[in-house]
Amino acid sequence: MTAWATDELTKMGRAEEIEIAVRRADGQLHNRVTVWAVPHGDALYVRSAVKGRNAAWFRAVPEMHEGRIWAGGLEKEIAFEDADHDIDDEVDAAYRSKYRRYAGRILNSCLTPEARSTTIKIVPR
C-alpha cells in the first residue's frame, strides 16, 4: 500500500467536499459523485451516508477497487480498501469535528449504523 504524502492528505482532508469516481471493469470511470471525507491517521475515509449500500458508487467499488479523487486542488488515482471497523468511533469523531457546523440530522446521517457499515479507506495508487 502506498501512503499519502502529508501535504496531499492535509489538502484533501481540509476540502469541504471531495469528488470520487469509481473505475469500471472496462477501465473507464463512472460519473463523479460528491461526498464528505475525513482524514484519520495516514488515510482518507468516506461513507455512503445518503443512500448507504444502495448508492451506485458504493455498489461499484467491489468491481475494481480503483478510481480517482478530486479534492483540495488535487487529482489522484486511488484505491478503495475495506476500512477497519475497529476505528469507526474515531472516524465518527473526525466527522463530528470537521462537519459540526451542519444541522444535526445532516451530520448524523454520516454516523448511523448503516453509514458506518459503508466506511471505505481511500489510499493513493
What are these regions (language model features)?
Residues M1-E19:
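Extreme N-terminal tail/first-helix region
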Residues T6, Q28-N31, E63-H65:
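Short hydrophobic/aromatic-rich motifs at helix boundaries and adjacent loops
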Residues T6-E8, R23-R24, I106-S109:
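Short, P/G- and charge-enriched loop/turn segments at secondary-structure junctions
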Residues L9-T10, W36, C110-T112:
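Short secondary-structure boundary/capping segments
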Residues G13-A15, H30, P62, A115:
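Short, solvent-exposed coil/turn segments
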Residues A15-V50, A79:
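Short beta-strand segments
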Residues K51-R125:
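Short, structured beta-strand-loop surface elements
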